[in-house]
Amino acid sequence: MLNIEQIKEIIPHRYPFLLVDKILEVDEGKRAVGIKNVSANEEFFNGHFPDYAVMPGVLIVEALAQVGAVAVLKKEENRGRLAFFAGIDNCRFKKQVRPGDQLRLEVEMTRVRGPIGKGKAIATVDGEIACEAEITFAIGDKKE
């Protein structure tokens, strides 16, 4: 298990754009499972929507991508590098995510060739699928 401080050592995201609270499982370079506790105090709820708060789908996908990045960047050869979100296919939103929900974020790498990879991503709330997608990422270095 990884806590928030350990996650911040792996991926560069910070508040308000760090969308993973903890990692429950990680199989380096292959798979990770994370948790996002969705609070009523999230900034995005101010405008999405003021009278009926729903987590934006793009942020659910971003949370999945961050969990995938942890899996990929935990691999020894990728430590200190960045995982860039490069694409999304077959994305479907099946359940609204509301304040008080706990998102379980699972990403499993399905194909990796050199610096490019694909993963199957599923976000669930109480065992029900909220979002599923195939995400593509690219491993790169920081440019000075």
Swiss-Prot record:
Gene3D superfamilies: Hotdog Thioesterase (3.10.129.10)
Keyword Disulfide bond among UniProt keywords: no
GO biological process: fatty acid biosynthetic process; lipid A biosynthetic process
EC number: 4.2.1.59
Domain of life: Bacteria
Similarity remark: Belongs to the thioester dehydratase family. FabZ subfamily.
Protein name (Swiss-Prot/TrEMBL): 3-hydroxyacyl-[acyl-carrier-protein] dehydratase FabZ
Species the sequence originates in: Bacillus cereus (strain AH187)
Gene designation per UniProt: fabZ
